[in-house]
Amino acid sequence: SNCRVSAFYATAHKYHDTLEACLSEDNIPPSLYDGLIETVHENLKPLHEYIALKKETLGLDEFHAYDIYQPISNAADSFACDFDEAKVKVTAALSPLGYDYQAALQEGFDKQWIDIYENKGKRSGAYSWGIYGVHPYVLLNYQPRYNSISTLAHEMGHALHSYFSNKSQTYINSDYSISVSYTHLTLP
């Protein structure tokens, strides 16, 4: 089984356990992993309160994972806007990240790093992609609603992470793991 293979690998390479072996691939110390898990556990109360409120508001007897995506109001509709206004909103929301970040974000907008709208044959979803020495590209399927604004901010976060990593690191050191990619996108 996969578990036995992982255990064998960890033992053969003299890791303390399989967790340490898995984390070592991304150069993540187990203490960081443990700290992230501990922080999540210490801060579950607001999530539980939100789920209880959502369950009550939706009139559900049981709450399932898919219910998390069910809207409880139309408030998000008030965020609906065209792409130009979305850029303004995202820029304002990311202003705490400073001048360099704002300048790079504006460069991405001005120099058309983003494939914005749905087209025939275009893949669904959204993602950021790039290679060293070339600015990143972002694929969106923008619609005038809150989720698209949020997705724009999220994907530009990935794009600017790549941009700054490539700008400040050599080729050999510019790549990063998915763990790093998603940890940096969580702003206080």
Annotate each predicted stretch with a short phrase.
Residues 1-185:
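Cation-handling catalytic/transport regions enriched in His/Asp/Glu
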